[in-house]
Amino acid sequence: MLTPISIEKEHIRLINLLHFINEQNRWFTIKELSDYLQVADKTVRKYLKLLEDEIPPSWNLLVQKGKGIYLKKPLNESLSFVESKILRKSLNLQICEELVFKKNSMQSLAQKLHLQVGALYPIINQINYDIQSSHLNIKKKPLEISGREQDVRVFMLRLYCNIPNDYWPFPYINKQNITDLINKMEKILNVQMYTYSKHKLCVLFAITISRLLSGNTIDNVSGLILVNKNDDHYKTVASITSELQNSFGVTLHETEISFLALALLLSLGNSITTDSNKTLTSYKKTIMPLAKEITKGIEHKLQLGINYDESFLTYVVLIIKKALDKNFIQYYNYNIKFIRHIKQRHPNTFNTIQECISNLNYTVYSHFDCYEISLLTMHFETQRMLFKNNPKKIYVYTSQGCIHREYISALLEKRYNGLIKIVRNTIINLTNESLQDMEIDIIISNVNLPIKNIPIVQISEFPTERDFHEIKKII
């Protein structure tokens, strides 16, 4: 969902309808859908026709008198393709793009969008209200989104990255050129990012390039920490500045390098796939005592009786480090859908951890928000499920990083206790050969993978009851 702004009710209802009829492997009545969406039966039928136009040819939306509605889709295809198509049509998204990347007056923007000026005003006012939570506002002359430059960029990043299926709205910027530069930075740092983290960083680079080309630079030094020039992440970004200038015609000054260095650090922090100990060496010694203090306090409250080894504590260090850094680039990894899911599924653990964090020194707990609390909740719940279940050949591949992958793995082990064994080797670039070497029988993934000869079950970001049903059938 486009979390930083409201989107049209019709788009929201279409997406909600799609997810609702996909959650369970059964027929739904018009009345059920009407009650769920809180609209008339006639409106439900209209939405079903709209949905039929959006789904791929390989899917089938069956509507039969006396039976109801049933969504038939291949196991290896996800809802994200359809959700992405719907969200890209959002008028509010188009308006935000115009306000960030182009120069307009109210009259010229209304003309572009084929609207009357009077119809455009309330939409602009609603967007202005929505973006205040991102510390931004809309200026009328010229008509643009205004605020700290880094906040404007991260706002657009959140818009784009909440559209599934690797949305790339930059026809004038070759994504492969940016990907090559990020691959180069990975080699310098000897790390590998997960697919989603790399895509997100690519989008931020493209937004930064677009803003720099239109003369918008980060000059509020007091609002952005300047990374030490001897820091590995700063030096890594600095090493590609000449290539950025040659390829895109932009010059990165110290504040711009610091901004991208922090984004790089947050991207790596979200999904470390090389040796965590090696990657965290520079700040692990400083943060580990705090990680142990937090873990001890949470264990005292939850009474899980689990042995918290160094591997577990390393991820606590990772979450703390990310919390301390993210205030300089606010909301970089914020995911409201993820937070809601964790709070609803594990309310006691979430509230307990939130209470423990609030008891820390203000200079520490003030950096934590619901996102970090949710990550810690997922991490502790993963240990709880692993502790109570005996792992038993499935490979889980997700786009969201190590903690998310471990969480999904633990959910599956708990659900199919004794029926499956999760293989925990971390491989970013999966091949048929590597999977056969591990004797993998089934792959469970929330992204499309170019793998043949091994069954793939496509799941949602968090498995639905329908996903669990399909997995059970195949195992």
Curated annotation (Swiss-Prot):
Ranges where the PRD domain occurs: 169-274, 282-390
Record-linked PROSITE patterns: PRD_2
Database matches in InterPro entries: BglG_antiterminators, Mga_HTH, PRD, PRD_sf, WH-like_DNA-bd_sf
UniProt key word Transcription: yes
Induction (free text): By carbonic acid and CO(2).
Domain of life where this protein originates: Bacteria
UniProt-listed GO biological process terms: regulation of DNA-templated transcription
Keyword flag Transcription: yes
A Pfam family matched in the record: Mga
Its job: Acts in trans to stimulate anthrax toxins expression. It activates the transcription of the pagA, cya and lef genes. It also activates capB, a gene required for capsule production.
Name of this chain's protein: Anthrax toxin expression trans-acting positive regulator
